[in-house]
Amino acid sequence: MIILFDLDGTLIDSTDAIVSTFHHSFDMHNFVKPTDEAIMALIGYPLDIMYKELGVQEEKIWDFVYTYKEEYRKIATIKTLLLPCAIEAVKEASKIATLGIVTTKTGKYSKVLMEHFNLMGYFEVLIGREDVQKPKPDAEPILNALKLLPKDEDVWMIGDTKLDLISANEAKVNSIGVLSGYGKKEEIKMFTNVIFNDALEAVKYLKTT
């Protein structure tokens, strides 16, 4: 079995880090700041898409992204928390499957975070934004992860937003939606029939399948 985990809202809570870094970038560029709610509603999308949706002009988006990344790497480990049961979920999953991370976050920062939490050693692969041309909801991130892992027909993607689940559907792999993050249950139900409160519940389910 292969289990692929999303990060934000699935294993970690980086809401504070993301929101504060967005505000920093808007301050640095003298741009009207969006509300916390507007930012949180877009978590899971690539940074350039988030800035576009928040009203930044096309030609300035990558300047904002650069400012964001410069600040985020300074504060990520300080302002990011593991979700309850995340450690147990990963440890239990490692007993029954080969593990990977598929995230829209920058991969190198994601690796630093996982090393900070002493969890990176459980994962055989980590696919981040810089590793793909087309991020989730495209199938590419999952397919790229699978190319780097031993072939296995029993593949599961665990994530908290429709982006994770659509990506899984496009990649023709199984999916589990979790309610520990940013996706609403009504929306998640549209893309998977398997839904649990958190990653640990999802892993316990997979131990019985």
Predicted regions: what is each one?
Residues 1-87:
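N-terminal helical cap/lid subdomain that shapes the substrate entry/recognition surface
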Residues 2, 136-165:
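Conserved Lys-Pro-Asp/Glu-containing loop-to-beta segment of HAD-superfamily phosphomonoesterases
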Residues 32, 57, 120-124, 152, ...:
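Conserved H-loop
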Residues 74-101, 107-111, 139:
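Short, acidic loop-to-helix structural element flanking the phosphoryl-transfer center
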Residues 87-95, 146, 165-169:
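Surface-exposed amphipathic alpha-helices with a cationic face
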Residues 120-135:
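A short, structured active-site edge motif that brings together acidic residues
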Residues 156-194:
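Acidic, Mg2+-coordinating phosphoryl-transfer loop and its flanking beta/alpha structural elements
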